Regions:
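GH16 jelly-roll
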Residues: 1-146
């Protein structure tokens, strides 16, 4: 529908979370898109990002570079030991680094060593003129362990 938002995101498997609950356990948004915008957002959530330092640059970072509205796009994420690296159509769009904080168990900046599961979702954006159904076309999803 014309008033839908689409998302491709990762949430931790609660059985293996290093930190329990949200946002402490982390959330990785590879793609968030609203019909209201001509860009996508890539976002990282953790206790550190959402509670300790909410003025950071990792909440809903707009991505214009490489994004082709109305076409299939390829989104990527490398989950590495010390960083999360995001891609759109082969272009690196964002990197979030492990800060190796001395007080990590208090700050909970890097919960991204847990196992995560993939969520593909659509949802209404705003309450005006809601119409159904809502679609998100996905050609393929590939997961590779490095």
């Amino acid at each position: 529908s014309d008033n839908a938002g689409q998302a491709f995101w990762l949430m931790p498997d609660s059985r293996y979370q290093i930190y329990k609950g949200w946002p402490d356990g982390g959330e990785i948004d590879i793609l968030e898109h609203s019909y209201l915008h001509d860009y996508i957002q890539q976002t990282v959530h953790s206790h550190y990002i959402d509670v300790v330092d909410p003025s950071n640059n990792y909440q809903g970072k707009p991505v214009y570079k490489g994004y082709n509205p109305g076409q299939y796009n390829i989104y990527g994420l490398d989950i590495l030991e010390n960083s999360l690296v995001f891609y759109t159509n082969g272009e690196k769009t964002m990197t979030y680094e492990n800060m190796h904080l001395a007080n990590e168990t208090e700050m909970k900046q890097w919960p991204f060593i847990s196992d995560y599961y993939i969520i593909l979702s659509t949802s209404p954006v705003g309450a005006k003129n809601l119409s159904a159904p809502s679609y998100m076309y996905v050609d393929w999803v590939r997961v590779t362990k490095l």
